[in-house]
Amino acid sequence: MNPFPGLRPFLFDDSHLFFGRDTQITELASRLRKNRFLAVVGTSGSGKSSLVRAGLLPELLSGTMASAGSSWESATMRPGGDPLTNLARSLVEAGLYDQDEPEIISQVRATLTRSGLGLLEAVRQSDKEKKSNLLLVVDQFEEIFRFRNSEDATDEQAAFFVNLLLEATAQSDLPIYIIITMRSDFLGDCSRFPRLADTVNEGEFLIPRLNRDQRKAAITGPVQVAGGQIADRLLSRLLNDIGDDPDQLPILQHALMRDGNRGIPRHGKMHRDRRGRRADLHRHAMIFHQKGDLLGQIGP
């Protein structure tokens, strides 16, 4: 088993491989108790999506928010080129409705567009257990700003989508929680929508850099889950090579995934000479830079 996902984010089913973020998970859950709208903000590849999907979601299902219980439904979406359809699709694919067919998605979309309370109405009409909470994750929220500037969009469409989210978390009748993940360089764009900047400011969670011990756990934890070990000398060199630069974390994850594809020795140790490891990291970094903003497009 290869315990490293590479460039893609950690998903819910990868939670047993997600290490080094315990403090952040606890803090995020604590903030969600006080604010139903959270904005997880950070640079490309800083682990925003992974923190929510593989960290927070399993934590919520464990009952960590006693006031909300442990019954949760979750839907994940990206705005893309049609935010309203993608929102409707995410609700249907999350199993909130007994049927999972194209016409159901169209019906849910129609409900969403009836009024500013469309998301509330869509949830009321769903087959979700009445006492269960709904967590909607809007990943790569910055896509809404690109959508607003596209030829196929209007200011009204983008603003309507944003307003649906804000209205859903401003009420207390239904237990709806929303988390957006967004690149930090788009924070200023939030002022383009009424109330969004203030709401983001109130619920902002800025992804901190991992310290050395946390980076160590992120490397050794998955290896140990896979039944292997990593040589102390190699571990020290890896930690020294990536340093405090968050841009190196996705590159390291990709390099470790490549090593994992070659096989992690059970009850043995991963070894690599310093020159070889540095060459690996440098080669992967060059590939990413040659492909442009790859990390910004698909990084975790």
Named regions from a protein language model:
Residues 288-299:
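Hydrophobic, low-acid, alpha-helix-prone terminal segments
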Residues 1-283:
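Amphipathic helix/helix-loop-helix segment enriched in hydrophobic residues with interspersed Lys/Arg
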